[in-house]
Amino acid sequence: MSDVEKVDGECSASGKRERLTLKLGDKLKVPPSLARGTSTGKSFTTVEVRSKKRRPGEYISHDDKRRSGLNKAVSGLTAQEQLFRINAINMADSISAKEKELAAARKAKEEEELAAAAAVVEEAVEEVSVEGDVPPVEAVEAAVPDVEEVVAPVATPSHSNKSGHDDRGGKKYAHGATGRHKEKEGVSIKKVASSRGASKHIKLDIENALSGLEDKRVTRFSSSTHKRRSSNVKSGRRISREVVISDKMTVRDLALAMAEKAQDVLRMLSHVGVEARMDTGLDSEVACEIAVEFGHRPRVVSIVKMEQELSDVCGDDFVSEPRPPVVTVMGHVDHGKTSLLDVLRKSNVAEKEFRGITQHIGAYQIDVDGKKITFLDTPGHEAFADMRARGANVTDIVVLVVAADDGIMPQTVESINHVKAAGVAMVVAVNKIDKSDADVGRITNELLQYGVIAEELGGDVMIVPVSAKTGENIDKLQSAILLLAEMLELSAPRECRAQGVVIEAKIDRGCGVVATVIVQKGTLKKGDIIVAGDSSYGKVRSMFDDADRVVTSALPAMPVRVLGLNAIPKAGDTLIVMPSEKQARDLLWHRSEINSAREENRAVPSFSGAIMASMDSKVEEINLILKADVAGSMEAVSCAVEQLVHEEVKFNVLHKEMGDVTKSDVLLAEVSSAVILAFNVRVDAKARDLLRLKKVDVRHYQVIYDLVDDVRNMVSGKLKPIVQEMQVGLLTVRQMFSSGKSGTVLGCYVTEGAVTRGATVCVCRGETVIGEGTVKALRRFKEDVKEVNRGLECGLLVDGVKGVLAGDVIKVLEIVERMRGVE
């Protein structure tokens, strides 16, 4: 039987691997094909590993001549060691082949880079020769004095250099041809062998040459694109540009405006005698001087003027087109404003409001006979005065709703004043004419004293009697609005950048910041960069109309809900579309500078005056945290709190924000002993779990009336009560008795009320007060009693009063504390 037994048979043509089993023997005999590493389709398994020490000096050679004598060389090794040797030989062969491939690839890449670099240098040489300042050879040598390169024209073909060798760690590596000649129009570059062994760094040398040429400002090249870039920058010259200098400009801002390094600007400032840092504000004169030193043309523009230039969305080049009217419905609370609007837009918003009272400003657009009308519904409570004023300022026509049964009310008068201040047209809708006590004539006469004269009385105000309940005369009201809008000839440009007014703003859980906007000019599109107010900007991610339909653009007078702002704007802020995000940030920066300048101009009380005021005043403080659903509601809540401030009670609003009550709100309220006023918002899950452990007062409201009453009660609870002395009894002294050590007992008759033991009494003789004291003992006959009523006689022992005579009058007093109210 042979030493090697086939187990799995012959290797198939498909390339299946044969398995060889090596049997026991004195020495392991390996087939020559396997020993030479040529058998790649076979695998073998050792049956037994025989341990035997290796003879000294035995090794496996890498040479093919020694590989044939493998059995003799490894006869002293174990079977496992011999297999390791064989595998190492095979792996070494594969690694050697891979190294050769990589070396060839590297060599080809180096040749390509060398050729490209040589081409760039040739272009540099040509450029220098064109300039005529320095000959080509001298220019390159002057740029790179330390590199041994020779640039010379040759007439013969280039020859490759001999290979160089370097011995590292006993191994030899072939460098190959490191220096080569590139022919182009009779010019070649030859690398001369360096004494420092830098023959393989020709690429670095060429890059240094290019850098030196760039320092001489001859031309600019790009080695990455292998193309020459022409430049206007020459030695000693800078690009001059117009630099806009504002009133307040920091060193960093000036450097950015000039496109210069901030360190260079600081160095120039130190040369002119100004010590500054990056955030130091510069005077406009100093900034202009620095700009001139850098060779620029300064132009001084005030911050206010710059803000106006940035916020100007359209000029005279845009043609105005007709637009729908914006109509605001105003009036006293519960006079039927929302119900009337529901009839106009054929909806039922009033029933969705809590108790039927509007708490937010709403924007809707309806279609009447093919013509659109935009309506704004405002709350009627006095706390929403700013909201109504805002509605009057953005509107074209005001529909003043007056209940026919109630007549003119305080918020009706306030709405009339807003209309007059805004200078807009007005239509009076006398609502609830379906009631039995309705009197339209009385309403017309009452309006006269406020300067509202009806058309039938010779004025210019249309008065339309309507009924939101039955729908009577609703068509006449619509016709009156359209007629007035036609007379006003309303128009606005559509092609310019959009501008609008923020009506409401809030934070939505799924959408982020949502702002309700009325577009006034231009067309607001999805993707526009917008700025709202002094701190909000962003990109319009999406828009929705009043019916929650997605829209991609909004024309003038169209109300939309805009998503994409980074912060909540204030209700009433102007929304502007900017050409770029950079200009949007610049506009916000200018507005912040204007606001900071206004803050600096305000009078600041002195430190000593503040200390004296705090020492003299003993004011009770109430810490509050305000939470509301929208910006308009937050404004109303803040207004209500400010109006209820008393001279003895002060509200400290620690934090106010739109959105639900959060965990941070609860923690802040705990450490500051604050009360959380939550208007139309809830408490989120994490804050709800925390409230079970913390003693924090969270008060929820859905109607502004309830919030105002509760805040008023909070103020009353902090005020010191009014102390009053009330007379509850009257006695007449008839006789005095001496009781020895106890004192004088007064025999009295109760003429009014009653007297009790321990009561406070005042002894009077005519109009003169003899003294005041306390009833120490009270007896009827010889029995101690607690109280003696009217018409009975009793004996009193009064502590603290002496010299009482018969006929004196004793008044029984009671100290009463009464809570103080807030108007």
UniProtKB/Swiss-Prot annotation:
Entry-linked InterPro entries: EF-G-like_DII, IF2_II, IF2_N, P-loop_NTPase, Small_GTP-bd, T_Tr_GTP-bd_dom, TF_IF2_bacterial-like, TIF_IF2
CDD domains found in the cross-reference section: IF2_eIF5B, IF2_mtIF2_II, mtIF2_IVc
Alphabetized PROSITE patterns for the sequence: G_TR_2, IF2
Annotated positions binding GTP: 331-338, 377-381, 431-434
Sequence segments annotated as region (G1): 331-338
Predominant cellular place of this UniProt entry's protein: cytoplasm
Residue ranges constituting the tr-type G domain according to the UniProt record: 322-491
Region annotation Disordered: where it falls in the sequence: 30-66, 156-192
Molecular-function annotations in GO: GTP binding; GTPase activity; translation initiation factor activity
Gene Ontology cellular-component annotations: cytoplasm
Known function: One of the essential components for the initiation of protein synthesis. Protects formylmethionyl-tRNA from spontaneous hydrolysis and promotes its binding to the 30S ribosomal subunits. Also involved in the hydrolysis of GTP during the formation of the 70S ribosomal complex.
Protein name per its UniProtKB record: Translation initiation factor IF-2
